[in-house]
């Protein structure tokens, strides 16, 4: 049975009538054109589908859209429109952290969440903050350095 689900998406109030058990990632990508939310593992393990739900980082591939009713969601599209998001994205580009690019939206979300809660993280804190996100291209060192660069720039 379909239900009307209302939530804030990247600062804009939206609603959709759909099956509340549909995966949130599918609604974001298919109904709201948030193509930066990537699907990797479909099990909540790789972090490619990371979003901010009420300011907390979550994996949207394992959350039913019904759980988003009345909540605030920020995707990479919303983060990239903020000053902090632009600083992080620029630091990733300048630091050479982007190769294939598939994991980067999730990595940027993780970095945004980390730096919002800890503006001057240690290397161990950065690695812990990124631990829910998988990258098979860079080996993480360039990503960690890019997070440091973003923190230094005020991200």
For each feature predicted by the language model, list its residue ranges.
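Signature of N-terminal electron-transfer/Fe-S-associated modules in redox systems
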Residues: 1-155
């Amino acid at each position: 049975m379909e239900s009307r689900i209302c939530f804030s998406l990247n600062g804009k109030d939206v609603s959709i009538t759909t099956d509340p058990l549909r995966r949130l990632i599918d609604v974001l990508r298919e109904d709201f054109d948030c193509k930066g939310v990537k699907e990797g593992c479909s099990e909540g393990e790789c972090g490619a589908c990371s979003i901010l739900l009420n300011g907390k980082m979550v994996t949207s591939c394992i959350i039913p859209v019904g759980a988003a009713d009345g909540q605030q969601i920020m995707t990479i599209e919303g983060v990239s429109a903020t000053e902090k998001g632009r600083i992080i994205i620029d630091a990733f580009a300048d630091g050479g952290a982007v190769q294939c690019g598939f994991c980067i939206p999730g990595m940027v979300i993780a970095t945004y969440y980390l730096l919002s809660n800890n503006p001057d993280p240690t290397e161990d804190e950065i690695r812990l903050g990124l631990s829910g996100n998988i990258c098979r291209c860079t080996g993480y060192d360039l990503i960690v350095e890019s997070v440091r660069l973003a923190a230094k720039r005020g991200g």
